[in-house]
Amino acid sequence: GRTLNKLEVIYDEIESLGAPQPAILPLQLSSASPRDYELLVDTLDKQFGRLDGILHNAGILGERTELANYPTDVWDDVMAVNLRAPFVLTQELLPLLAKSQHASVVFASSGVGRESRERWGAYSVSKIAIEAVSQLFAKENVHPNIRYNCINPGATRTAMRAKAYPNEDPKTLPTPDAIMPAYLYLMGDDSLHMNGQSIDAQD
């Protein structure tokens, strides 16, 4: 979730399961400074000592319009959240990922990240680029214990989907919970053999 209240609900759910105590470390991805990333890494290092994985799931849609008329400020915002933030976060967190026995970095992709479509603008460009980022991290990897993959959630019942397809009946779409097994697969040890791949959550 983007709000502290939503994060606190997840925090409480994790604690209720008897899992290790989590931490809430908010970071505004659209405007984070190098110092913000440094503080995040330092805090994670002090509290946990290592990082077993990253799921880069934050994203914004931008505008559904032609590139010829695409607002540059919206373009910059989409690129900051969808492309720059996951790249910088991964780069900064590499030392903590390297301390894990098996670390998994998962980037959120999209159908328009495989093939561009008209009027998807910055969102499509950012997702095509994030697929390349994942592949390059995988190919250039100097830490054999870290793997990098992409996942395309497909048509899912989310606010972003409703914004992109306002005339679509959301009840016809699977919920995020329904596709969660695919995410858990990529984050867990069952996918140790996968690196530099891109999968569809609904296949």
Residue ranges and their predicted role:
Residues 40, 65-67, 74-76:
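Substrate-binding pocket helix/loop in short-chain dehydrogenase/reductase
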Residues 90, 126:
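Active-site helix of classical SDR
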Residues 110:
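Residue(s) in the substrate-gating loop at a strand-loop-helix junction
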Residues 115, 136-146:
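Active-site-adjacent segment of SDR/Rossmann-fold oxidoreductases
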Residues 143-146, 150, 158, 167-203:
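C-terminal helical subdomain
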